[in-house]
Regions:
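A short helix-turn-beta junction within AAA+ P-loop NTPase domains corresponding to the substrate/partner-engaging
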Residues: 485-489, 698-711
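Conserved lysine of the Walker
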Residues: 449
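P-loop NTPase motor domains
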Residues: 52, 59-78, 85, 89, ...
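Post-Walker A helix-loop "phosphate-sensing" segment adjacent to the P-loop in P-loop NTPases
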Residues: 459-469
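Hydrophobic anchor at the beta1->P-loop junction of P-loop NTPases
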Residues: 441
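Hydrophobic positions on the alpha1 helix immediately C-terminal to the Walker A/P-loop
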Residues: 452
Length: 776
């Protein structure tokens, strides 16, 4: 027997004591706050890591992930035990629903909240949304003291985090409470905590930490066990196929039940492994030589070596070649899994289903007979291995049991954006938790991008007190905003709604002196009126002087009374002695006293409404530059005021590519995009014209730096551009190619997840959000 294996078996061997209580049945002797557990001389530490998009990756990407995962396995030290665990944990249904459903507010909008909640509940029913999958890597090592163990885990923990980061998986070491929570969830299910976990209080009172996590009762039978009122069974992989597909583990775990699957790995030093295989090869060659000698003695000189001997020789040589030339390591492994059910009948049915999945992959799973206790202690991430039905594996054959499937997005307190196209789980993201929560929604006309944005607006309007500002070039949001009690501002030369370009109060801008920023804005206004870039230094000085004169009385009155307008600015220019002043007045006359004077009137709309829709559809080409300037100034100052009051602001800009036709609006949004996170705000850009948007280097930079993107159905030319810019694989591109309305890819924090999103047509919310003719 290999020295490493015999040593591990000897050190893990311990006397069996009949447990006299449920607490004694839990094989943890001692714990430390940093998450290290002790059992005899063995110390263990658990690391939680996130899933990655293995299922939808291209063949080349899968190969790369496989090699990176193999590298992680090769990095495991000899003499340790590693346990990779997938935990299908059932979420408390009431808590889950409470976290995503909208509470009623009795503000006249509860009808919409009820509809929205019904839609969410329909998405939960019949899916795995009550099951949350977590992944752990538990490392166990024999050490003399906790200090030695802590030093070791500090080193190996860094290696584990680094190797998993190469796979785009985030890993973290679990502290004592997080680690014990795994066992509590398994043993107690949905039973609420009677008291919070506090290690110091346990020590102070002289009680055991096991009281917090252990079940009321545990009964072990020949081939199953019972925890409280629930039934469970431990299975193990008895026989493996010659070739195992890499999706077997994900298929076994794609099951709407509480289950835990663990793969125990015992790495062997390469020198020991090579020596062992050489000895085995020598034994095989000796058997072949002895067989040939017997045949020769019988004058049978042409006899062919028996197939079984030839196969042994071939497989042993291949194994030796793997170890010596292909950087493979020998490992001993065992796969175990435990599943729970509410009844014995359901348990037997689930067991048969799991066994059939294994048979489909030409593997043989079996129930542990009279070893359910040892099996349970092996499969749970204690860091122990009580079942010794070990199989000799190489790095490659171990890596085939890859624990990755598809990424999920489930951030507490977030917004529902659809369902994972692979797992059908809800995708709930919280943009406030991202480093840069700005977003783009990209898709061809009719792909569902404005509907998706409206869904987000509905959630924000019904669930939060945040302010929502919409730049609406196509009048698409008018009906929804009015239904939600918002203010629609029609910005045009003929509209009865007016926005005063000279609006200013004490909170204007982000400086101590609002006049400084307002004067700078007035210069920008007159640049648009006279012609971009045509203001001379003398004209700028005249405008600055006039602005100070116009605002003097208003500022002295404490920003009360009538706010000056561009007409006051015109009169002040006419009073100046310089010829240039009259030239400025004449150049701007069309927009102040002429037919396009809508921004020279006092503001007559409620700019304090929390939902504002700036409808600029009828803003003509002549008025568009000035209209964009005034509208964007109004939006930005609302953001600043909200920031000072501690409020969050969400800005939605439809047909985003239009903004990049004008230098001022393009520069404004670029600056806003970079700065708005500082002011507790978030920008969302929507566009169908991706190709035109990507012609702007500024827009490309904004798109590449966005942490949250929703990509819907794309035109072929746009797909290629986006794939290159956002590093989207060919397989992932298939999810934005000729797909159903509302389906596509979500990119969140660098993770790309395919999604689908449908909304019932027989609801009032759908009629408010749809833009399809005949449905609204």
């Amino acid at each position: 027997m290999i020295k490493t294996l015999s040593q591990a078996l000897r050190m893990d061997k311990e006397r069996f004591k009949v447990p006299k209580s449920v607490q004694q049945a839990i094989p943890i002797q001692r714990i430390w706050p940093d998450g290290i557990f002790q059992q005899g001389t063995k110390f263990s530490k658990t690391y939680r890591f996130t899933d990655i998009n293995y299922y939808i990756a291209s063949k080349d990407n899968k190969t790369e992930m496989f090699l990176d995962y193999s590298e992680l396995l090769n990095s495991l030290d000899s003499g340790i035990s590693a346990k990779i665990t997938i935990n299908n944990r059932r979420i408390n249904k009431e808590e889950f629903e409470k976290s995503i459903l909208l509470p009623m507010k009795e503000d006249g909008l509860d009808h919409y909240r009820e509809e929205y909640n019904e839609v969410l509940l329909s998405k939960i029913t019949g899916t795995n949304n009550s099951i949350y999958q977590e992944r752990y890597l538990t490392v166990s090592v024999h050490k003399r003291s906790i200090d030695d163990a802590r030093t070791y885990f500090a080193r190996i923990g860094t290696d584990i985090v680094t190797h998993l980061a190469k796979l785009s998986s985030t890993a973290e070491g679990l502290d004592a409470e997080s680690r014990l929570q795994i066992f509590r969830d398994f043993f107690k299910g949905d039973v609420p905590q009677a008291f919070p976990f506090d290690l110091k209080q346990f020590a102070k009172k002289g009680t055991s930490f096991k009281d917090w996590m252990c079940p009321d009762s545990m009964e072990f039978e020949r081939d199953h066990f019972k925890i409280g009122d629930r039934y469970g069974r431990v299975l193990y992989m008895q026989d493996y196929a010659s070739y195992v597909k890499d999706d077997m583990i994900s298929e076994l775990c794609d099951f709407s039940r509480n289950l835990i699957l663990s793969i125990d790995i015992l790495p062997v030093p390469t020198d020991e492994a090579v020596r062992e295989i050489q000895n085995r090869l020598l034994g095989v060659e000796t058997n072949v030589t002895n067989w040939q000698r017997r045949q020769n003695a019988n004058n049978n000189f042409s006899a062919i070596v028996p197939y079984d001997m030839e196969l042994q020789r071939k497989e042993t040589k291949e194994m030796l070649d793997d170890l010596t030339t292909r950087d493979q390591r020998m490992m001993f492994g065992i796969l175990t899994m435990v599943h729970l059910a509410d009844s014995k009948k359901q348990l037997d049915s689930d067991t048969e289903l799991l066994l059939s999945i294994a048979r489909k992959h030409l593997c043989q799973m079996a129930t542990l007979k009279w070893q359910q206790v040892d099996g349970l202690n092996t499969v749970l991430p204690y860091g122990l291995r009580k079942i010794n039905a070990l199989r000799t594996l190489t790095t490659e054959s171990t890596a085939v049991l890859i624990p990755f499937h598809t990424q999920e997005i489930l951030q507490p307190g977030g917004i529902y954006y659809g369902q994972n196209a692979v797992s059908k789980n809800l995708l709930v993201a919280d943009r406030k938790k991202l480093m840069n929560g700005n977003s783009f929604r990209l898709g061809v006309s009719g792909s569902g991008k404005s509907f998706s944005a409206k869904e987000e607006i509905v959630h924000l309007a019904l669930a939060t007190d945040d302010d929502i500002l919409i730049l609406d070039p196509e009048s698409e949001f008018t009906k929804l905003v009015e239904a939600l009690g918002g203010q629609v501002v029609k910005v045009s030369a003929t509209s009865d709604n007016h926005l005063n370009a000279m609006d200013m109060d004490a909170a204007y801008g982000n400086e101590k002196n609002p006049l400084i920023e307002k004067s700078e804005f007035i210069l920008s206004v007159f640049e648009q009126l006279v012609g971009a870039g045509n203001l001379s230094a003398k004209e700028k000085s005249i405008l600055d002087r006039c602005a100070a004169d116009v605002y003097r009385d208003y500022i002295r009155s404490g920003y009360t009374g009538e706010v000056p307008t561009l007409k006051d600015m015109y009169r002040q220019l006419m009073l100046q002695p310089e010829e240039e002043a009259r030239g400025l007045a004449l150049s701007s006359e069309l927009f102040i006293n002429g037919s396009l004077n809508t921004f020279a009137q006092p503001t007559n709309v409620n700019k304090k409404n929390r939902i504002m829709d700036y409808d600029i559809r009828e803003l003509g080409e002549q008025l568009m530059p000035l209209g964009m300037l005034v509208t964007l100034d109004s939006i930005f100052n609302r953001v600043i005021q909200n920031w000072k009051e501690g409020k969050t602001t969400w800005i939605f800009a439809d047909e985003f590519y239009l903004l990049f036709r004008y230098e001022y609006s393009a520069n404004f949004f670029y600056r806003l995009y970079k700065r708005i996170r500082k002011y507790n705000g978030f920008v969302t850009g929507l566009t169908q014209n991706v190709e035109e948007l990507l012609k702007s280097d500024t827009a490309r930079l904004m798109l590449a730096n966005s942490e949250f993107l929703i990509l819907l159905n794309q035109a072929s030319t746009d797909r290629e551009e986006l794939a290159a810019l956002l590093n989207i694989s060919e397989n992932q591109l298939s999810y934005i190619t000729n797909v159903a309305v509302g389906s596509g890819l979500i990119r969140c924090s660098g993770n790309i997840v395919p999604f689908e999103n449908t909304f019932p047509k027989n609801t009032d919310l759908y009629k408010l959000m749809t833009t399809k003719p005949g449905e609204s």
